[in-house]
Amino acid sequence: MCERALRHPETSRDAAVHAQVLITLACFRSEIGDASTALRLLDDVLVIDQQRLPAVLTARGMVLGRSAHPDAMPALNEAIEVLADLAEEDQQPGAGPSDLASALLNRGFLHMMEGELGAARADTEAAVAAARVAGRPGVVHMAKHNLGYIRYLLGDLPGALKAMAAASELVPDAVLAVPALDRARVLLAAGLLAEAGDHTAVALAGFTANRAMPDLAEALQVRAEIDLAMGDPGPASWAARRAARIAAKRGNDRAATVAELFELRAHALRRPTSDGSAASQRNHALGDARRAGELADRLSAMGLTEDALAARLLQVEAELDAATGGSPRSASNGAEGTSPGGSTWRSTAARGDRSGNLAIRLHARVLSARLELAAGAPAAGLIHIRRGLDDLARFQAKFGSQDLQSGAAVHGRQLGALGLRTAVETGSPAAILQWLERSRAVTTRLAAVRPPSDPALAADLGSLRVAFDRARQAALAGRRDPALEHRVAELRHRIRSRSWTAGGSGAVDRPLALSAARRALAAHPGTSVLALFHGTGHDHALVITARRARYVRLGEMAQTESRSRRVASDLDLLADARLPRPLRAVATGSLRGTLGRLSESLIEPVVSQLDDGPVLIVDAGPTAALPWSQLPALRGRIVSVTSSVSRAIAGLSAPERGAHVNGVLAVAGPDVSNGEKEVRAVAALHRDATVLAGDEATGRGVLDAIPADGLVHIAAHGHHEPDNPLFSGLMLADGLLFGYDVAPNPHLPAQIVLSSCDVGRTDERPGGEPLGLVAALVRSGVRTVIAATSRISDEVAEHAMIGYHRHLLAGLRPAAALSAVLDEVSGITDMPAPLTCFGGSR
């Protein structure tokens, strides 16, 4: 369009128009990576119209900045100085606040890239003011967005997401590639890989359509980093190579060299699984080491010190792989630090430990630990692992969002895996406990997430409740409504984005020591902790009692996972009262056999180590949602399930006074046979209990009626959301009551009983963080949740729940009350009751 305008005779007759067309064309040529043509066009502008000098200087600074040219900052400094002089002289033809806003915005961006964040913030805030005076909402939006990006660079991820979300509201209908890429970077840093990938896809599409090659190269680097975090080196390597080619073609050596770093990281990720002899693998590692060293030298010469350090750590890792054959326990002179290589390795890792970049620090901790392990010092290696995981926990504690807290665990995956191998090889129960508490379900060491009450969030949740229910009904009727489904997706995105902006307390609990756990158990005679964990292809158990602690290696993990899936499938089938008798007999036999085999592989090898009282099962993996009380070796035992030993021990000191004495709310959702009958029977057992049924059982009605520190009993069908537990929920009269609804509610119950749904199911994020409605409720501060881990028949639920409440009133604590009623139900019906007590409760 600009080139056509230049050919039009009217353009050449109007100097101002001619100059503006040339400036616009220069900016476009810069966007597609043709900096030399862009600079020539800007020189032509000054031949036509000298009064456009400030605009030309601003555009020149932008063009030079996008190609990382050292003259970019001087050009912008000169532009801003000229604009300031013109403003003082009140001479502003074509050189007013609009040009000043652009110049300040671009100089602020250059300051960001140089790490001068104070100067970046000052320029960007000034750009907002100038853009408002000039009436340029697009520049106001971009500057406010950049202020969010500065927060990201300062390490304030919730603040960054909040500022970026506020900026996007200034242009609500626009789909902008640059802001999408920046949000992807923040979400990647927070560990929300799928969400970061979605935003990167938007950015890639936008940059490709606009032929914005410099930005496309950056987006490809982010895509490569996401793939690396997902453990997928093939796509990461492809994206990094393409980014390097694009950057090199447009003469941006710095960007091309940084892209090489991502390709080298993909090589490192692929190296442990490469085929070939030991000699060929060693040669492969040495080749990677040479390349990493050369890359580190080039990055250092360019002034990219953090990237150079990352490359140097890759060099150390490759040389260490070559020296040890990839085994952290293989000793070598280099690893022991008795050769020049060993000394260099240690000093490089130590520099990484002091980096301001979390990913670099964690990588350095892995290497420091490997160096100690290779030198035959496992205790010293575990110290590095613990410090790295503590660093990660402090990072997670900055978030006031369960989503971000659990997502960030992905950054500790390599440290956690190394910690598992190391701790297990020591065989020390104390070391294993420290690893468990630091590396798995790290969010259990953080304060309960209680976001403040937010009217806008409440309104969005109400809208989502209605839209979700309408979309569900349309789908069930065979008439899917794409517009409604789009509305549901839009509301979910808005709700999640809002939750990400909350900051955390920053507090991290100290992991429980084995001696402290045993002292606590001594105050509760007969109680045992059975901590199960999974890795290196096997299941493992750590048994802790007041008198002893013992580690036991169990069976193969793959078999356990397969059997766990079979149990869930059989339980779902048996919950259907309409199941024909022959099929019921087959499913019952299958369930009994599988439960027996799970009992043999997981419980019987350690049952002799357990005391004869309650069993506190600690599991955050694929077996967490097993119906533990149904395993033969645990039948009749008082069993509760938590995700950490610290939380299990803390539950021992929960108030003896039951939650029901602080008030009871009983709720019946729609389409639950006998649901209203059940909740009215439950309410009749308790003094002054509140009942919500029929049209009264709405989301708002339930939230308003929750008794503080009391008991909430809900007979309603559930919805399990694998990707985000806070979108799991319970079906009420007006739609789903979401996990997002409960956390910010002013009143939170101490105990929630979910009698008619299978929201006790759980999934796991990379890094060992459990996902599911139960996990979300416990993280919000609910002390105990009684829920089914699979489907349960309405008839069994009614029998079990009325008996459960009777036992509570008789003075039993939740886990004991549930154990007693499960024994009773097994004598009434052969239909299973897969109910579990989650949380710290005996």
Locate predicted features.
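Residue-level detector of the short coil/turn that links helix A to helix B
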Residues: 33, 67-68, 115, 155, ...
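Single-residue signature of alpha-solenoid repeat helices
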Residues: 38, 72, 120, 160, ...
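Residue at a conserved register position within TPR or TPR-like alpha-solenoid repeats
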Residues: 22, 29, 64, 104, ...
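Amphipathic alpha-helical protein-protein interaction segments
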Residues: 327-350, 359-363, 377-635, 660-665
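Catalytic cores of enzymes
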Residues: 516-578, 582, 586-842
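Residue signature of alpha-solenoid helical repeat architecture, marking inter-repeat boundaries
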Residues: 16, 51, 98, 138, ...
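Residue register of alpha-helical TPR repeats
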Residues: 16, 20, 55, 62, ...
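Amphipathic alpha-helical segments of tetratricopeptide repeats
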Residues: 3-10, 43-48, 78-91, 125-136, ...
